[in-house]
Amino acid sequence: MRVLVGGGTGFIGTALTQLLNARGHEVTLVSRKPGPGRITWDELAASGLPSCDAAVNLAGENILNPLRRWNETFQKEVIGSRLETTQLLAKAITKAPQPPKAWVLVTGVAYYQPSLTAEYDEDSPGGDFDFFSNLVTKWEAAARLPGDSTRQVVVRSGVVLGRGGGAMGHMLLPFRLGLGGPIGSGHQFFPWIHIGDLAGILTHALEANHVHGVLNGVAPSSATNAEFAQTLGAALGRRAFIPLPSAVVQAVFGRQRAIMLLEGQKVIPQRTLATGYQYSFPELGAALKEIVA
């Protein structure tokens, strides 16, 4: 297959490209900077969709960048980097003389309302209660194509765990130093997925003709934030009991953004499993041991 990957130069895109190449597929990236095996977003807008069998969009400014203040400027970047790239790809697919057979978008579990008791599968309601859930609703709407000539899949991803990037890039040092612990109360759910499995689900969605609609990109075993901290500490052979106070999280990220760390959702990959995807890392302990090894 020839696969076009928007925003493919980041942590998830690199893992997906490696897996697709290993499975014999040809990958072209869409990015801001030109280079071998790439086209730019401007080229896509001007020349339309290059010939491809499938397209994926992973583009989006990192919401939890601690170096960026949560102000109106950054919020516009967060929204624009997702909606504009998705709209551009969707428009290019619609106009293509031979549209791709599959179109996959990665969004987030922020669609579901944080809760200490609720359990969410792909059919659960959401998408209308705060900044982030509304963003996911608009983002997924931007990807929708008229007709059914192209198979459409949305993967709502949890926190992506992997070596050399993503959430682990910020967390490993304090945990290695024995200074790690739960965030806030630690009671909030922590919907997670190993980078290998997120790349695996995306590849499964591209290759399997029966897959369509929403898939939850989370591991089948749920954990709270405190359980995650304890399990990561154990994988490193360190104690992990020093909590990061809610007030500190709110001071660094702003109240609205801090919700993503201080509250969480129990998300079940019901449809993902039903499509036949087999997880490489269904359990948190094994996933973290592989990452820190």
Swiss-Prot record:
NADP(+) binds at residues 31-32, 58-59, 77, 82, 160. GO terms for cellular component: mitochondrion; nucleus. GO terms for molecular function: oxidoreductase activity. CDD domains: SDR_a8. Keywords: NADP, Oxidoreductase. It holds the Pfam family DUF1731. InterPro entries: DUF1731, Epimerase_deHydtase, NAD(P)-bd_dom_sf, SDR39U1. NCBIfam families: yfcH. This is Epimerase family protein SDR39U1. It comes from Homo sapiens (Human). The lineage of its organism: Eukaryota, Metazoa, Chordata, Craniata, Vertebrata.
